[in-house]
A protein has these predicted regions:
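Small/aliphatic-rich secondary-structure junction motif
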Residues: 2-62
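A short acidic, glycine-rich active-site loop
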Residues: 61-74
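Glycine-rich, Arg-bearing micro-motifs that act as flexible, cationic patches
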Residues: 118-144
Length: 153
């Protein structure tokens, strides 16, 4: 009988992060999970989302994109602060579009680059009335994601 080789697959958590309390809980939960279950890494993703009903002039688009850059820098700094003591490997991406679609795109990209990783999307729950009426990001992810989705309360 030969010795079995242990192969631990890397856990790659895709965390939707907008700085809200729910997103902060999801990020902190991800860091705690990887602290007890290495190896792994976190990709923090902020998605700038304008509804399809918004029509902007080219000048207004430039202003909004500059504002998005500012917000992305602030959110990256907030994520860095939350993860500073965790010693977890992480990176930050900001994207523009539908939040669920972009989180799924990041997960697919990670799977394409690292097919042996275990990829999970982590999001914070939302209890807002608007999300109950039009559907939350978590619900959209649950219906369309090719990878597991964890909703952190």
């Amino acid at each position: 009988m030969g010795a079995e080789k242990s192969s631990v697959r890397e856990l790659h958590l895709i965390v939707g992060f907008d700085g809200s309390p729910a997103a902060t809980r999801a990020l902190e939960t991800s860091a705690r999970l990887l602290a007890v279950r290495p190896p792994g890494r976190i990709t923090v993703v902020w998605v700038a989302h304008l509804t399809s009903t918004v029509r902007l002039s080219p000048d207004a688009v430039n202003i909004v994109e500059h504002d998005f850059d500012q917000v992305a820098q602030e959110l990256r700094a907030a994520a860095a602060e939350r993860l500073a003591d965790s010693q977890v490997s992480w990176d930050f991406q900001w994207r523009q579009g539908s939040i669920a679609h972009e989180l799924i795109a990041v997960a697919k990209s990670v799977l394409a680059d690292h097919p042996h990783d275990v990829v999970v999307i982590e999001v914070g729950s939302s209890s807002s009335a608007m999300h109950r009426m039009v559907g939350s990001v978590a619900v959209n992810l649950a219906h369309h994601s090719p990878v597991p989705v964890t909703i952190v309360p």
